[in-house]
């Protein structure tokens, strides 16, 4: 990380020189992806994590709303339960009501003026420091809270709450620094200079349970660009989300730039969309919720001081398409990881698999063999666990209902798994289903659980099957094609051009890396906000304006041809 003084000097600098303005472009801020630690037996990182997990045993952390730089404790108290041990209340938190949310909006609007004027170098420095804290002394804490609170295994927590969140903070800082260096052409003797300012008003950040990193990014990216944010974290990710918020504050984030406001969803949505100061919504969640927010914004357009910007990612019904030329080992390993890691609770998880008849006996045998080795359990006590419980009782009931549908449908056959048990935690066995009907609802609708449905197609009808892949569902987030035949890969890439925002070849549909594979979809999967690339920080700036365009003094107001 660059020291503050050096970081400032790396940015666009300018100074008065007589009657003109002199400036130069920014240098690039060097960052790299955070290494993923192994957590092998006896390693320092494993020992530190084990201690952090032990510290959380049977503990309930009290979490306030943070509004106006004050911890506010309301009477509307809620609890976050550990998914794999719902007898453990990991967090006690309170909801903000409409009055408190309006107070937060007022505090945000007041804080914006000073925050937006702060040099981007100073703002970036805060997020770089937070990244260093997450990479070092606070790593074990954020991993343990993500594991216990959201049911992640050590590797899934490491990928999410450490590596990806650190990458978001560092790469966004890089993108912000470099954006300042993008300047218009200056033709002597004139000099043009642009400033990238934050949006006028406040941004509402609404984050999901399944990635600690997403919460930090939804709130952090707009704040980095000079905006003020009301952050509504997920009830089922409260423990880790509050830890991220505290780390940002300890890294130097000023009061009221991000305010931490757990709230009832409809209350939060109604309040922010009725405020004249709303300038943006940064969202990850369900399609119905995002559509509702869009409608609320549309209905209130006449009251806003500016047109709000809406960015949203809404999940997917992601596919793996297998051609007869595919490598079976890659298909099996990639599909098991994509479908069942974190219990299928990733927006990018594979939930529909298309397999040619010629390979189905081999792939089926391998899938069932490897499926029998998957261990589902308590990831805090057994690091051999591949995935844990689903997030809460609501998710458990939804997935169980789909499995009951699979048992009763004549076109569906359960090949493995699918047992459910909520006596201790919300456990669902990874389930593999074969469908005779490619248009069966289970092939169309997002389940968000450890359920993989397979459709076996005649080898010679691969083109028709590619059309099915493209047209079956309303989503368009991620997908993968497995084929060794380059001609088939090219053809599939053309035919599935609009079927996925992140399209993989001979690799699983999950696992995008910040700065390498910017993540986002289209269709019902969202507005394509594209975290992980420069466009994200640009989204949260006003169109640049020219504060100084220095030219020779204008003489006669008339043009020469008029004389």
UniProtKB/Swiss-Prot annotation:
Q: Which sites are catalytic?
A: 313 (proton acceptor), 347 (nucleophile)
Residue numbers of N6-succinyllysine PTMs = 30, 92, 98, 113, 129, 174, 346, 394, 508
Q: Which residues carry this modification: Phosphoserine?
A: 43
Write out the pathway annotation from the protein's UniProt entry.
Amino-acid degradation; L-proline degradation into L-glutamate; L-glutamate from L-proline: step 2/2
**Disulfide bond annotation, renumbered to this chain:** none
The positions annotated as site (Transition state stabilizer) read: 210
Q: Name one GO cellular component term.
A: mitochondrial matrix
Q: Where in the cell is it found?
A: Mitochondrion matrix
Say which domain of life the source belongs to: Eukaryota
**Coiled coil residues, start to end:** none
Q: Which GO terms describe its biological process?
A: proline catabolic process to glutamate
Which reaction(s) does the protein catalyse, per the Swiss-Prot or TrEMBL entry? Answer: L-glutamate 5-semialdehyde + NAD(+) + H2O = L-glutamate + NADH + 2 H(+)
What single Pfam family name could you report for this chain, choosing any that match?
Aldedh
Report whether Coiled coil shows up as a keyword of the record.
Answer: no
Per the UniProt entry, the Enzyme Commission number(s) are: 1.2.1.88
- Keywords in alphabetical order: Acetylation, Mitochondrion, NAD, Oxidoreductase, Phosphoprotein, Proline metabolism, Transit peptide
Residues binding substrate are 512
N6-acetyllysine PTM sites in chain numbering: 51, 92, 98, 113, 129, 174, 317, 364, 375, 461, 508
Stated role? Irreversible conversion of delta-1-pyrroline-5-carboxylate (P5C), derived either from proline or ornithine, to glutamate. This is a necessary step in the pathway interconnecting the urea and tricarboxylic acid cycles. The preferred substrate is glutamic gamma-semialdehyde, other substrates include succinic, glutaric and adipic semialdehydes.
Q: Share what the entry says about its subunit structure, partners included.
A: Homodimer.
* Family to which this protein belongs: Belongs to the aldehyde dehydrogenase family.
Q: What is this protein called?
A: Delta-1-pyrroline-5-carboxylate dehydrogenase, mitochondrial
**Annotated source species:** Rattus norvegicus
């Amino acid at each position: 990380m660059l020291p503050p003084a050096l970081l400032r000097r790396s940015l666009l600098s300018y100074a008065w020189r007589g009657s003109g303005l002199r400036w130069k472009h920014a240098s690039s801020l060097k960052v790299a992806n955070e290494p993923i630690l192994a957590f092998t037996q006896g390693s320092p990182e494993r020992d530190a994590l084990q201690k952090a997990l032990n510290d959380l045993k049977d503990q309930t952390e009290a979490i306030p709303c943070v509004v106006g730089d004050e911890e506010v404790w309301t009477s509307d108290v809620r609890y976050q339960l550990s998914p794999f041990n719902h007898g453990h209340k990991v967090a006690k938190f309170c909801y903000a009501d409409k009055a408190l949310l309006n107070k937060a909006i007022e505090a945000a609007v007041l804080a914006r003026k000073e925050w937006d004027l702060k040099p981007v170098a100073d703002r970036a420095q805060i997020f770089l420091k937070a990244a260093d804290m997450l990479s070092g002394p606070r790593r074990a804490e954020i991993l343990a809270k993500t594991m216990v609170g959201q049911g992640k295994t050590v590797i899934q927590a490491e990928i999410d709450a450490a590596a990806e969140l650190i990458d978001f903070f560092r790469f966004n800082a890089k993108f912000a620094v470099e954006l300042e260096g993008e300047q218009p052409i200056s033709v002597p003797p004139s000099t043009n200079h642009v400033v990238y300012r934050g949006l006028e008003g406040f941004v509402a950040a609404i984050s999901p349970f399944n990635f600690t990193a997403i919460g930090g990014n939804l709130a952090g990216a707009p704040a980095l660009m000079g905006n003020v944010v009301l952050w509504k974290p997920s009830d089922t990710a409260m423990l880790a989300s509050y830890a991220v918020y505290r780390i940002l504050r300890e890294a130097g984030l000023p009061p009221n730039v991000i305010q931490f406001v757990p709230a009832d969803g409809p209350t939060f949505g109604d309040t922010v969309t009725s405020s004249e100061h709303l300038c943006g919504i940064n969202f990850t969640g369900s399609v119905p919720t995002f559509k509702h927010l869009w409608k609320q914004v549309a209905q209130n357009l006449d009251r806003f001081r500016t047109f709000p910007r809406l960015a949203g990612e809404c999940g997917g019904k992601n596919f793996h398409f297998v051609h007869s030329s595919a490598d079976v080992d890659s298909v099996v390993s990639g599909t098991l990881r994509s479908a069942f890691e974190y219990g299928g609770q990733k927006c990018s998880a594979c939930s529909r698999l298309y397999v040619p008849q010629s390979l189905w006996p081999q792939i089926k045998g391998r899938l069932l063999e490897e499926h029998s080795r998957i261990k589902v359990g308590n990831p805090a006590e057994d690091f051999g666990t591949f995935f844990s419980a689903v997030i809460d009782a609501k998710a458990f009931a939804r997935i169980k209902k789909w499995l009951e549908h699979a048992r009763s449908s004549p076109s569906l056959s359960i090949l493995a798994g699918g047992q459910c048990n909520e006596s201790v935690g919300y456990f669902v066995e990874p389930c593999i289903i074969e469908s005779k009907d490619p248009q069966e609802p289970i092939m169309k609708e997002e389940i968000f659980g450890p359920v993989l449905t397979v459709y076996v197609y005649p080898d010679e009808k691969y083109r028709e099957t590619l059309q099915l892949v493209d047209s079956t569902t309303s989503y368009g987030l991620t997908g993968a094609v497995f084929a060794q035949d380059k001609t088939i890969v090219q053809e599939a890439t053309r035919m599935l051009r609009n079927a996925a925002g992140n399209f993989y070849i001979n690799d699983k549909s999950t696992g995008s890396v910040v700065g390498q594979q910017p993540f986002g979809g289209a269709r019902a999967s969202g507005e394509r906000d594209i975290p992980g690339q420069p466009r994200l920080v640009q989204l949260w700036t006003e169109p640049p304006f020219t504060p100084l365009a220095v030219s020779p003094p204008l003489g006669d107001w008339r043009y020469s041809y008029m004389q």
